[in-house]
């Protein structure tokens, strides 16, 4: 026996079925009455050989109506913490969609690095991305990984700043949350003034930790706390 996600409105004693298929994921958007739905049904054959895609829609959890956002998304798709933006990947780039206007922006087009994990052995039509650390407070920016560093990029793509300096020494920097959020709680915003990083030297195999601190002109600085030889 399998169940579909639904919402029970206690004030009206109505139950709205949010899910329509077992081959989809439903993720409520915190602070709203909407949910992000990734529909896999049209691409089940491709998914069986590791080349899946999904159609992304917004479901209204009050009325049950659905609004299509993007078809055949071959990478990841998620909504920013405040529900303002859809973040998805396409063609080796990160894109945002303003959910109020439905305007889309390629936010990494002019960034002089690659966010694609070219060493992945994935058989999908598009190689996976290195991923993201998350969003900063109030959806001001999304923090995206390349092979070694973190980039702070605004949702309109107009500002892109590398906030670590790992490429020169081939040291991979990745954001880490020391105090994990409890079950069901949203992740804390990426803190570029007090947050922590894990470090790994891809050439030397050394590893350690570092910490962000506030720098000059709004640019954070990174200080190594631990940096150990391979054991």
What is each PLM-predicted segment?
Residues 1-231:
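Beta-propeller folds
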